[in-house]
Amino acid sequence: MLLPRDLLLLPWRRATAAGEAIARRLNHHRAPPFSDPDDDPPFTRLAERPPRAPSKKKKKEEEDQGGRIRPPEPASSDLPFDFRYSYSETDPAWRPIGFREPTRFSPFGPGRLDRPWDGVAAAAARGEGAGAAATSREEVLGEPLAEEEVAQLVERYRHSDCSRQINLGKGGVTHNMIDDIHNHWKRAEAVRIKCLGVPTLDMDNICFHLEDKTGGKVIYRNINILILYRGRNYDPKQRPQIPLMLWKPLAPIYPRLVQNVADGLTFEKTKELRNTGLNSSPLMKLTRNGVYVNVVDRVREAFKTVEVVRLDCSHVGSSDCKKIGVKLRDLVPCVPLLFKDEQIILWRGKVKQENSVSLQFSPEPS
């Protein structure tokens, strides 16, 4: 006979037995614990797979990559001009007085070009290649475009949302840009070039080097926007081979742009002109990476009435200020007197002053 207390305990004992059976089944299926005390039980250890042997395809890609770094034979190009980093912003007549890196380090890479690098340019072999290149350029351009054809191309490529656009910055017409232009010419008849910064001081120079180095023709020019046409008979399969520069070479060291005493002046007069320029109001305020197509004309016009001109180049950068001064020296022409706190002081020069005086007092022809 069961007592009431036993009746109350019987369901509890049955539940305990059932729980023990479930626990035994769970322990049977549970993986044995790891011996390593650093293992975290909530996470499952993945089996370590042995490293796979490199496939033949991957090995071939590595060999090709190694070949691109140091090819078995150096590349050669039939282009008749010397290879430089920038064609429009450097002048072959400028001779450096030193280099910031050894000249044996060619920016084309070790053993990748058959032209020796002298620290400034990779000179081409002198021969009769220039005449042949000019003849081939005329053949590629073909017959001149009609006005209707020019208008159609301009309407297609002149807009700002054009996908065939190349931005030309303070580096000017660079060597690798020539390859970019030919890449666009594979699928487009023309390419839109947007020019900004220091090179816009001389747009004629940019147009000349674009046509001379690529073989195309500028069919549209509006302020700083150019459209470069490839030619009627252009064949992408016969494009010239252009070895690419792998890095930008360090600029050589050139003589000082500003002398302590300007030519034809004394030290006191030079100092007086510098103070006069600093205390005068600026002729123009130039912005960084702006469009400077009208700066040369405005400086020339100002020199008709004043002797010293100041240009405010705040936030332009000291490097760009000196580049602007070099271009204005050759284009105006004038004499840079001072570069201080991103301010450019220009003097019209003694020769120009004497010419203006002689013209003022010269008798009129009878």
Swiss-Prot record:
Localization terms from the record: Mitochondrion
TM ranges: none
SUPFAM superfamilies to which the protein is assigned, alphabetical: YhbY-like
Example GO BP: Group II intron splicing
One of the record's GO cellular component terms: ribonucleoprotein complex
Region of interest (Disordered), ranges: 24-82
InterPro entries, per database record: CAF1P_plant (IPR044599), RNA-binding_CRM (IPR001890), YhbY-like_sf (IPR035920)
Ranges where the CRM domain occurs: 143-241, 263-359
Keywords of this entry: Mitochondrion, mRNA processing, mRNA splicing, Repeat, Ribonucleoprotein, RNA-binding, Transit peptide
PROSITE patterns: CRM
Molecular function terms from GO: RNA binding
Domain of life: Eukaryota
Biased composition (Basic and acidic residues): 60-71
Transit peptide residue numbers: 1-14
Subunit description: Part of large ribonucleo-protein complexes that include group IIB introns.
Function: May be involved in the splicing of group IIB introns in mitochondria.
Record's protein name: CRS2-associated factor 2, mitochondrial
Species name: Oryza sativa subsp. japonica
Lineage of the organism: Eukaryota, Viridiplantae, Streptophyta, Embryophyta, Tracheophyta
